[in-house]
Regions:
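ATP-dependent phospho-/nucleotidyl transfer catalytic cores
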Residues: 1-42, 53-54, 149, 153-156, ...
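Short, surface-exposed acidic
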Residues: 13-14, 110-122
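Amphipathic, well-packed alpha-helical segments that form the structural scaffold of globular domains
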Residues: 21-25, 46, 79, 103
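Catalytic activation segment of kinase domains across protein kinase-like and atypical kinase folds
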Residues: 46-84
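Secondary-structure capping and boundary motifs in well-ordered enzyme cores
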Residues: 37-42, 63, 67-74, 78, ...
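ATP/Mg2+ or Mg2+-diphosphate-binding catalytic cores
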Residues: 124, 129-171
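Conserved acidic
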Residues: 37, 90, 94, 114, ...
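Active-site activation/catalytic loop segments of kinase-like enzymes and analogous catalytic loops
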Residues: 68-110, 126-146
């Protein structure tokens, strides 16, 4: 992480960089906090990876770019999507309602979940986008444009973690 912190200095806020240092220092506790129920997770679930089409008043959605697929709790994709899709202020204003709709959708499909359980998972997986910013930034060729994008991801998802007090769930 020190090389990432150096790379993001001046592009990501100091508190966001400190957050990453604390996350890395407590990564084993973070993984130990994972719930045991897993599903197929995209792990890069954002608007850029959704294709929409409309025909005869029906809307279809296709999800693309499955290179990071894995077994994770479903709330990890939910937290990543919400954190990546909204401005910080819009996320703050809408996230509880969106998580409630997510829970209602699962329950309607006979996947019994409670809002409190999913909300706790959503808070824990506020880390999803932040971790992706760290990992992806070292896997691709470094460019100024890429650094700006990964710093923006770290800032947005880091603020999500701070707002949700994610660290309290594993530190």
């Amino acid at each position: 992480f020190p090389s990432i912190a150096e790379r993001f200095t001046g592009k990501a806020g100091d508190e966001i960089i400190s957050l990453g240092e604390r996350l890395v220092a407590n990564i084993e506790r973070y993984y130990a906090a994972f719930p045991s129920t897993l599903t197929v997770a995209h792990r890069d679930f954002r608007l850029d990876n959704l294709l929409f089409s409309a025909r005869d008043s029906e809307i279809a959605v296709k999800v693309v770019d499955w290179q990071t697929v894995g077994a994770m709790p479903g709330a990890s994709d939910l937290a990543y999507f919400i954190g990546a899709s909204f401005t910080v202020e819009d996320r703050r204003n809408r996230e509880q309602a969106l998580v409630k709709i997510y829970c209602e959708g699962l329950n309607a499909q006979q996947v019994a979940v409670s809002f409190n359980d999913i909300w706790a998972q959503y808070r824990l997986f506020g880390t999803s986008g932040y971790i992706m910013a760290i990992v992806a930034s070292v896997l691709v060729k470094q460019t100024d444009r890429g650094d700006a994008m990964f710093a923006a991801m770290a800032n947005r998802h880091g603020q999500q973690m701070l707002d949700l007090e994610t660290e309290k769930l594993f530190v």
